[in-house]
Amino acid sequence: MSEFISLYSGSSGNCSVVRTGEKYIIIDMGKGVRTTSAALKELGLNISDCAGILVTHEHSDHVKGLATFLKKNPLPVYGADDTLDFLDANGIVPASCALRTLSGGEEDVGDFGVTMFPTSHDVPCVGYRIHTPDNKTMTIATDLGVL
């Protein structure tokens, strides 16, 4: 059974998980490694089962925890060109982690099918439609300016 779980949300940090069984993906990581790791552990999730991290945009409440988390857990990071360029230029993603640009069509992220779509915000921002291994579809869009 697939689930969408908000680990934390608000102006101090945002992070969510979509999981099917033990397999999962993370969306954004706006708080430190301790907070995120504790939340994942509380859910019984092992980092080895994570397919990667989807990033919606560059604001600190969505990426503040990435650098330290990725140093300990070198996962692939997915997103739009503008956001990945920002993360790379600012040293947020270590060289040991792959940056993978999503094009807008459905692409495989582990066992999940992910489609990126643009959203309205003051910096380039995207949402994600996630097709799970058990044939469910979930959509996440954060920090929406206008619908």
Regions found by a protein language model. Give the residues of each.
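Divalent metal-coordination and catalytic microenvironments
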Residues: 18, 28, 57, 77, ...
